[in-house]
Amino acid sequence: MQAENDSTVLHLQDNTAAGASYERERDAETAVLHRLHALLAAETAAASDRARGVLAERAGGELSARWERDVSAHRWSERVSALRAARSGLCFGRLDHTDGATSYVGRTGLTDPDGTDSDGTDSALLDWRAPAARPFYCATLATPLGVVRRRHFEIAGTAPAERVADFHDDVLDSHTDTGSASDPALLAALRAPRGSTMRDIVTTIQAEQDEIIRLPLPGVVVIEGGPGTGKTAVALHRVAYLLYTHRERLARSGVLVVGPSAGFVSYVGGVLPALGESAVVFTTPGRLAHGVVATALDPEEVARTKGSLAMLEVLRRAVADRQELPASPITIELDDVIVEVDRATAAQARSRARDTGAVHHAARAAFRDALGALLVGQGVERLGADLEDPPEIAAILRELEQGELGEEVGPSGAAQVTEELRRELRDDLRRDSGFHDAVERLWPVLTPERVLDDLLSSPERLASAGADPALLRSVGAAWTVADAPLLDELAELLGPPPAPPAASTDDAERAYAAEVLAILESADRDLAGEDPDELRPTDFVTADVLAARQVPGRLAGVAERAAGDREWRYGHLVVDEAQELSAMDWHVLLRRCPTRSVTAVGDLAQRSAPAGAGTWAEVLAPVLGDRWARRSLTVNYRTPAEIMALAAAVLAQYAPEHRPPASVRETGEQPWERTVPADGLAAAVAAAVDEEGARLGPRDRRRGTLAVIAPDPAALPPLPIPVHTPVSAKGLEFDVVVLVDPERIRAHHPADL
């Protein structure tokens, strides 16, 4: 079965402008576009000059001054990148207001230093996220929002020589509301072939989408909608809107976007950079544990168990079980006495360490100190000196290199001897490998991976932690997606391991300087191609030279710093395909966003994960209570009506409580189905791929994307196009899909269809 979208691009023309008049108006709009590109180039050059000027400055000796200089240079470089990201499709619309003023809407805001705008202000171009640009997306005949005409541009050419090839007007003071879902500008965008990456939708955001995009920052909002409603695009554009509206706050903390798979992250990862936003980190549920990339899946019951919040207590016990008591006394031979760590001594030290309330590694120091103090006391007692006999005291003091006291020892001598003995024993223990071995044995330095692997591969440890014995697996088994939040929780319970010796100051400063240059050079590469003679930071400063003027820290964009820091706390969290996340996933993600500012995107009718959400309340209530709201998208912009008719039939059978979204368009082509013998399936799939590929054009010039979705890709022959499982295809879009063995997919889980 296949589904193909019509890729015809509509020719749009304002019905009120004809012939020469239309051409003159189109040329006038092109002239405006050229002026906007000139303003953009000037602002970009000014920002670039500021970045270079700040970097070239020699800051004073104060570390804070040097840091502020570097931060300023980096911010200006980010501004340059954002401006240059706006070049393609710079301006895409115009608003004519009831007061006679005209506003142009585009990818970034621009000011006109000459103040020559028709409304008398210096705003030459409105950023699409600005409040003043909202009527471009929301004005209707019923609610015109002070607008009499909205104009959509079709842009041709490449920046900075773009031109207005066509335009379409929505006249909002007539009896025809052309701002509906049948808007030709929208349909033209929807019928355009898909590429290997998602495109932004700033030119065609619809009113119901814009309302969600502009919701306030605080709080948790669940965006629910069926396939094709633009949930992901809305969430990403909401991120861009929030970064614009709350720049100072979110620029420091960043935004975390969680997608269902690495393929999905790759598909959507270019949208925000194209909108000029870089303070965003993308990840997947299988990467929630720092340094771990998990893709394997557990059996359904195991995944369901691991996804339960009951695992929090299991993991806490698993860590506590590693704080052990010796089965038999541990002997430590010091210079003058032998001491022993027996169960009672270890238990007393363990109790003192646990009473601190610190996590495992932080409490290890308390355990070491408590155990050392107990052994020092034991050593003093075992020395057996007669501390009431002055000559004996004097002899002990001489042994402790306090011979200057001679035989004249007063009543305080016993206390002095005791204190000196304690000091000597503390020093002996500090140097003694046997003591450190005992601490490591009873309160070891651990990694999350070691704890979880030991737990899941040991029936005894599982039983001691109160875990389901069904979790048992072999030692060293590959990490699964459901293991990732468990590993992250263990990292929280363990805390950072004891720090290794720090690198030399020179090395740290040199590494820091090299990173600064790498960041700025990377930003410059984004700008490459405009001026081959343009100087770059590395043209006039090296890492060694720059190191001499840097603070010994790390200067990088918020995304780079956040991605490398497990304990980073984000200002906003976006979760796509949120219905697939377990309660444990939500637990560790919300820890990363203490402000509880969250945009969750999903469709309960498409849930297939064993530990995913049956209802939103079921998965969100344990971690959020009732502090969340739900918004729905009801219009299917992407999927043609012919395809949705099939999907709706499946939905009615297994989830009749869910209503499919209404498609805005038809293609006139019905999906086809072929039934072949089992031994001919592979050949039939290959033939279908060739046939549908030919309809899209030559392989190196195809207008659109083609993919195969199959329950078992390994059973198919090598194909020249992507082959996905229903799970790996989640969130992706294609122009043509060859769906293999849909009945087998339905039997496994109807939601996968």
Regions found by a protein language model. Name each.
Residues 344-572, 581-585:
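Conserved helicase NTPase catalytic core signature
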Residues 248, 253, 262-306, 494, ...:
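Conserved helicase motor core of SF1/SF2 NTP-dependent helicases
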Residues 2-19, 23-51, 55, 179-181, ...:
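P-loop NTPase Walker
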Residues 297-385:
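ATP-hydrolysis module of ASCE/P-loop NTPase motor domains
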Residues 191, 254, 258, 298-308, ...:
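Hydrophobic alpha-helical scaffolding
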Residues 1-202, 207-211, 545-546:
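Extended, charged low-complexity regulatory segments
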Residues 315, 490, 643:
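A residue-level signal for conserved active-site and pocket-lining positions in enzyme catalytic cores
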Residues 2, 47, 51, 79, ...:
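Alpha-helical structural signal
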